[in-house]
Amino acid sequence: MSTLRIPIALQQAVMQCLRHYLQLANQHLGTAYPEPKINYHQRGTNAGSAYLQSFEIRLNPVLLLENKQPFIDEVVPHELAHLLVYRQFGRVAPHGKEWRWMMEQVLKVPASRTHQFEVASVRSKTFNYQCKCQQHALTIRRHNKVLRGESEYRCRQCGEKLQFITINPD
């Protein structure tokens, strides 16, 4: 897998945003939380992830390159809020009242759980399966489990075992 190069100006914009919201939080909370580590190794359709114990934020490089400033403005404070909530309150619901409070009252940004970025470029290939009543799209992970005989999947409507038909031409 090749690594995408994130232009230095975009990395600087990420860090500027991170530092802005971290400063807001430290002032509001009366704390001196350190700057989290940022890396650009998030894969799939997730825009970002917060690694609580290592105080690290992973950002999706493809979605960052495609969406630039809107991505930074939405995803960086979202993931930072997860880290701050963990430091402030310990283990709580990921998008619970503490996280919403951190987003809205401390960081002063809307508390949105999911992003609305176009994900066609990062969506994984799916595999068509069918039962008696409909078609189903399985991820490559589930498809491979079927091929190895580790799992079988059944339709929630009719209960029939799903049968492989074709690969989706994504």
Swiss-Prot record:
Gene Ontology MF, one: zinc ion binding
Entry keyword set: Cytoplasm, Metal-binding, Zinc
Protein name (database record): Protein SprT
UniProt-listed GO biological process terms: response to stress
Cofactor(s) required, per the database record: Zn(2+)
PROSITE patterns, sorted: ZINC_PROTEASE
InterPro entries cross-referenced by the UniProt entry: SprT-like_domain, SprT_Zn_ribbon, Uncharacterised_SprT
Organism of derivation: Yersinia pseudotuberculosis serotype O:1b (strain IP 31758)
Location in the cell: Cytoplasm
UniProt domain SprT-like: residue ranges: 22-165
